[in-house]
Amino acid sequence: MSRIGKMPIPLSNQAKIEITDTDLTVTGPKGKLHQALTPQVIITQEDGVVTVQRIDDSKKAKAMHGLYRVLISNMVEGVTNGFTRKLEIAGVGYRAELKNDFLALTLGYSHMIYFKAPDEITIQVPDQTTILVTGIDKALVGQVAAKIRSFRKPEPYRGKGIKYEGEVIRRKEGKAAGK
C-alpha cells in the first residue's frame, strides 16, 4: 500500500467534493477545481473524509494511487486557503511593477519584459523587488512563478536575478588574478 495514497484526505466544512465516473470537482470559498480521473483508482467520500484506493497492484495503479491522493489534497487546500509563491528580485536597477493587467519587469535587458498572467492567477507587487503569485491551483501557481523566474535566473557570481523566497543560490568564486 502506498504510504501517501492510504492516508485519508480530511474535508473542511467549506470544501465540497463531487465525484463522477470520469471526473472530480472540488468547490470552496475561493473557487472551483476540476480533475479528470483514471480508471486505476476508486475515490470515495464519507463522513467528511475522502479516501483513494487502487483497483489492483499493477505498477500503473500504484503510481496513480499516490498521485491522485496528493492532487485531491492540493485541490481541497487550494479552494479553502489558496497557494502563494513569493519571488525576490536582486540586482542594481532590477525591479517589477504592475501596469494594467501586465507585470512589467526591468531586468537589465535593453527592453522591458511584459508578462500577462492567466485569469486564475493573481500577481501582486508589494514593493519593487518582491512579486507574489497567488491562486487556487498549486501546479499553475508554481508554473507561473517558474515562468517569471526564467526571465532572469539568478547567476552564480553575484546572485543577480529573480529567485524564490528562501532559495539558496550556490555561489561561485570569480577568476583569481594571476601573477
UniProtKB/Swiss-Prot annotation:
Keyword Hydrolase: no
Gene Ontology CC annotation, any one: cytosolic large ribosomal subunit
Pfam (any one): Ribosomal_L6
Example of a GO biological process term: cytoplasmic translation
Entry coiled-coil feature ranges: none
Cystine residue pairs: none
InterPro entries: Ribosomal_uL6-like, Ribosomal_uL6-like_a/b-dom_sf, Ribosomal_uL6_a/b-dom, Ribosomal_uL6_bac-type
Keywords: Ribonucleoprotein, Ribosomal protein, RNA-binding, rRNA-binding
Single GO MF descriptor: structural constituent of ribosome
Zinc listed as a keyword: no
Record text on subunit structure and interactions: Part of the 50S ribosomal subunit.
PANTHER family: 60S/50S RIBOSOMAL PROTEIN L6/L9 (PTHR11655), LARGE RIBOSOMAL SUBUNIT PROTEIN UL6M (PTHR11655:SF14)
Family, similarity comment: Belongs to the universal ribosomal protein uL6 family.
General function of this protein: This protein binds to the 23S rRNA, and is important in its secondary structure. It is located near the subunit interface in the base of the L7/L12 stalk, and near the tRNA binding site of the peptidyltransferase center.
NCBIfam families, alphabetized: L6_bact (TIGR03654)
Protein name listed in UniProt: Large ribosomal subunit protein uL6
Organism of derivation: Chlorobium phaeobacteroides (strain DSM 266 / SMG 266 / 2430)
The encoding gene: rplF
